[in-house]
């Protein structure tokens, strides 16, 4: 068993993913952690798979969690958590916006988060205005259904002990896109304490953050809203 598994849900990141992974390797090696990187590739239709396959040939700390079909962000994230053979799980996005240099702050607090979760709070968030507006709008409904003091419930920079997931895993597939909103809501529902840590939020390494087309937002919002209602009504 590894001490730490870093789970990367990856989709269409052929030009940037190796730089992202190498940045994390550099920081984790400095901390002398027994770690692995879980490559939860999610049915990319560019050259991401072949780029990652070459990378894995030269790195024994990489866990291959690649599939042909697209599982979606939620499916890829949950799958990566399940295959990770480690005491601690860190989940981060794979676009370079999560700064590896922030991780030492999380790791130094790991003994304080037994049976709890530590989530990042993105300072000066580098996302589009539309994405920020959607987060604020959905955040209102999230808070009304699951009151909490978390400043950034959708932040994809989350550390927890793997054993904790058994308390909430039955709820985690209730939404397709808004995984971390649901994760935080499930923790609130099960009275799992959540700690927050300010983190740096960077521009993407390459390309633009995926934002759904405007005409798709109503159905996406409704689906995720219904997922939160389902969680609210669940035992």
Question: Model-predicted segments: where are they?
Answer:
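Cell-envelope/extracellular polymer assembly enzymes that use nucleotide-activated donors
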Residues: 3-5, 36, 182
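Short hydrophobic beta-strand elements that form part
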Residues: 5-8, 38-39, 66
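Short, well-formed alpha-helical segments that are part of the catalytic scaffolds
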Residues: 13-28
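Donor nucleotide-sugar binding loop of glycosyltransferases
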Residues: 13-16, 44, 73
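Conserved donor nucleotide-binding strand/loop of the catalytic core
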Residues: 35, 49-83
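A conserved acidic beta->alpha catalytic loop
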Residues: 41-50, 96
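Acceptor/aglycone-binding surface of glycosyltransferases and processive sugar-polymer synthases
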Residues: 68-83, 88-91, 100-177, 204-225
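Catalytic donor-sugar/metal-binding loop of nucleotide-sugar-dependent glycosyltransferases
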Residues: 175, 184-202
